[in-house]
Amino acid sequence: MREVEKPLILSIVGNILLGLIKIIIGYVYSSISLISDGIHSLSDVITSIIGIIGVKIASKPPDESHPYGHSRFECLFSFFIGLALFFTAYEIGKFAVERIIYGEVIEVNAIMVGVAILSIVVKELMTRYSLFVGKKLNSQVLIADAYHHRSDALSSVVVLVGLLLQKFGIYYGDAIAGIIVALMIAKVAFDICLTNIDYLTGRAPPKKFFELIEKEALNVDKVIGVHDIKAHYVGPRIHVELHVEVPSNISAKEMHDIEVAVKNRLESLENVERAYVHVDIVD
C-alpha cells in the first residue's frame, strides 16, 4: 500500500465506525442531531473513496494520451471534495435554521455527550494525520480530505454544544453555533476549490519562484545569463521552461552538459516535476 493511501483507508474505516455509533445512539435516544451527524460521517466515506481513486489515477506514468502524466486528476478529485464540503456546509446551515424555526426538545444524557466528544477527538486526530502526510507528500487529495475531517469535527462540536445547551434549557444557541460552523466550512471549501482550479488551469507559480529558478540556473558553471523563464502548474507539480546563455567559445559537448546540469538542478527543487532547458550562445 502506498503511503498516500493509508490516511484515506483510515478515513473510510473511521467514518464507517463513527457514523454507525452516532446513528445507533441517536436512534436509541431520539437525537436528530446525532443521527444527522452520523449520516454526515457515512457520506464522507464516499469522498475518501473518491480520493483513493484520484490518487491511483494521478500516480499512473505518462502514456500516449497523457504525455505529461496524470497528476491533474488528483486536483480534479480534490475539487470534487471541495464541492462536497460546500454541500456539507449547506446541510449543517439548513439543519441549524430548521432548529431555530421548529425547535427540538429531547432528554440529553452522558452517553450522547460522550459520543459527540469521541467524534470530535477522533476526527481531530484524523485531521492532523492526513494533513501531516498530505503536506509531506504534497498530496492535494490528502490535504482536502484533512480539512474535510476538520469540518466533521466542527459539526460534532455543533452537536455537542447543542446537546449541552438543550440540557440547560437554551434551545437556540446551538443553532447559531451551527450557522457559524457552516460558514467556516464553506470558507475551507472555497479555498480548496480555488486552489485546485488554479492547478487544473495551469496557473503560473508566484513571482519568487521565478527568481529562484533564475538564481539556481545561474549557479551552474558557465551559465552567464537566463531569460524567457516560463512555468505553470500541471496538477500540484510545476513544469519549467527557460533559456540559458553560455559563451560562444565552448564545445557542443559542454553545451549539452550545461543543459543537463541545469535540468537536473531545477528538477531537484521541491515541486518541480520537469524542466525544459534551451541553450543560447552569446558573443
Swiss-Prot record:
* Residues in the signal sequence: none
Provide the GO MF annotations for this entry: monoatomic cation transmembrane transporter activity
Q: Where are the transmembrane segments?
A: 8-28, 38-58, 73-93, 100-120, 175-195
One Gene Ontology cellular component annotation? membrane
InterPro entries from the xrefs?
Cation_efflux, Cation_efflux_CTD, Cation_efflux_CTD_sf, Cation_efflux_TMD_sf, CDF_Transporter
Its domain of life reads Archaea
Q: Where in the cell is it found?
A: Cell membrane
Entry similarity comment: Belongs to the cation diffusion facilitator (CDF) transporter (TC 2.A.4) family.
- Designated name of the protein: Uncharacterized transporter MJ0449
Organism expressing this protein natively? Methanocaldococcus jannaschii (strain ATCC 43067 / DSM 2661 / JAL-1 / JCM 10045 / NBRC 100440) (Methanococcus jannaschii)
